[in-house]
Amino acid sequence: MNNLEKFVAQHLQNAITLKERFKALEEKEWDSITVMMELNVQIGHIFTVMKDSQGIIEEGRQINNLGDEISDVLLQLSYLSYLEGVTFEDAGEYDSDPYSELEGLTILGGELGEAILEKNGYRFKKPRQGFESIDDLIKNRIKRMMAIALKLGNKANLDLGLEFGLMCADATNFVAVRTA
């Protein structure tokens, strides 16, 4: 069982449930475009942690924990997979990728964002070589990005199961405090 298969088996439903809880705090309903924008924010946070040793310090939070930021990326990708109807029966095929971790998150994230904009009528439609439909491209990019994020955590010697669990607990508490 590879990293993506393990993550899907152990954490995918928890991620979807957590994102559903956040609906209580939303002023507007989130769709695939909104989730994609949040995914871009979280990928930026990974770059902040890895490339800027200072981190970002905001009132009440610091962006300096790679495990938490990777977990945030996985959370957004998990919810995006739910919104886009992605299934993971082929997760075993996503064990390696030609891109390095940061390169892959950036390039594939750009391709995913473009495809979601195209699907939603914000960009012109064009044929995608190697894919039967825009949905096939979206599904592929989500799975590849999840596998790359998990690989990044492994290379950093992180226990992403633990990190993801901590992030989910913290986020659940965040929602509970604000909806009490």
Indicate where each model-derived feature is located.
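Flexible "arm" and connector segments at domain edges
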Residues: 1-180
